[in-house]
Amino acid sequence: MAVQQNRKTRSKRGMRRSHDALTGATLSVDSTSGETHRRHHVTADGYYKGKKVIGA
């Protein structure tokens, strides 16, 4: 079994955890409708990069 040989310090624990923070999704504003959407995703209206790609 994996059992530590020496206790890890608070500093080492913090350094390891420094990369664990979650970040929110990056958002963009559509140039056509002004709607906020996730980057590289189609808006709810069906626009992507200012062009209608879903629906008529």
From Swiss-Prot:
Residues 7-16 have a biased composition (Basic residues). GO terms for biological process: translation. Residues 1-44 are annotated as: Disordered. One of its GO terms (cellular component) is large ribosomal subunit. One of its GO terms (molecular function) is structural constituent of ribosome. Keywords: Ribonucleoprotein, Ribosomal protein. The keyword Hydrolase does not apply. Residues 25-34 have a biased composition (Polar residues). The keyword Translocase does not apply. Belongs to the bacterial ribosomal protein bL32 family. HAMAP family: Ribosomal_bL32. This is Large ribosomal subunit protein bL32.
